[in-house]
Amino acid sequence: MNNRVHQGHLARKRFGQNFLNDRFVIDSIVSAINPQKGQAMVEIGPGLAALTEPVGERLDKLTVIELDRDLAARLQTHPFLGPKLTIYQQDAMTMNFGELSAQLGQPLRVFGNLPYNISTPLMFHLFSYTDAIADMHFMLQKEVVNRLVAGPNSKAYGRLSVMAQYYCQVIPVLEVPPSAFTPPPKVDSAVVRLVPHATMPYPVKDIRVLSRITTEAFNQRRKTIRNSLGNLFSVETLTEMGIDPAMRAENISVAQYCQMANYLSENAPLKES
């Protein structure tokens, strides 16, 4: 039997499809999401409706974003979900979540079992809409969740950690084994909750500057910042900010990255592109 077929649908590798089928795991995720009637719930990648059905049971309306044409068509004709659903058959990377929030009249509650091949770029896309999002619950590769929650001085800490924690409070919810999926992925999975900060703990003047600094620092993470960021900061400037030039990218806190970004915004602002 082909273990890529589930409920009559052949999982497409190019869409990174792995379908959740463990009832205990599904119930645990739905409990963590705790959907309520009247909320603007949005699911990314509903697939074969493993989460869509139990979430939809609790709601009058549910918005879903599904790239796979066949799966979108199945949802359209779903016996009890169909009338409740607003289906966008498109790539979530092209979705304007700000416009969607405005249409629905409130901040979005976004959830989904995300395709692992696009999870990181999709996170960055969603971070740009955090003012339109109340919270997010995602199933991700466990290694990605570890990176999202990691603090300084750890191997998992990187650009994704800094940017996620700049925008959101990041809370691990539960770990999920490969056996909970069809076909089973080759990696462990985990569910994470991301809650955009109501008030930014470390506001930056220009997010593009923070993005540039973290990219340059972590692209050369084995170098000291004296070297990796030497084109942006002198040793004297780093020292004045209380940042040791001998530290590496992984030793610098989110607050310190934001401090560096604001210094650069004030003293060498990026030109408008």
From Swiss-Prot:
Gene3D superfamilies for this protein: Ribosomal RNA adenine dimethylase-like, domain 2, Vaccinia Virus protein VP39
Protein family: Belongs to the class I-like SAM-binding methyltransferase superfamily. rRNA adenine N(6)-methyltransferase family. RsmA subfamily.
Reactions catalysed, as given in the entry: adenosine(1518)/adenosine(1519) in 16S rRNA + 4 S-adenosyl-L-methionine = N(6)-dimethyladenosine(1518)/N(6)-dimethyladenosine(1519) in 16S rRNA + 4 S-adenosyl-L-homocysteine + 4 H(+)
Protein name: Ribosomal RNA small subunit methyltransferase A
HAMAP family: 16SrRNA_methyltr_A
Lineage top rank: taxon: Bacteria
Source organism per UniProt: Salmonella paratyphi B (strain ATCC BAA-1250 / SPB7)
Subcellular location: Cytoplasm
GO cellular component, as recorded: cytosol
The EC number(s) this enzyme carries: 2.1.1.182
Keyword annotations from UniProtKB, A to Z: Cytoplasm, Methyltransferase, RNA-binding, rRNA processing, S-adenosyl-L-methionine, Transferase
UniProt xrefs under SUPFAM superfamilies: S-adenosyl-L-methionine-dependent methyltransferases (SSF53335)
GO MF, one annotated term: 16S rRNA (adenine(1518)-N(6)/adenine(1519)-N(6))-dimethyltransferase activity
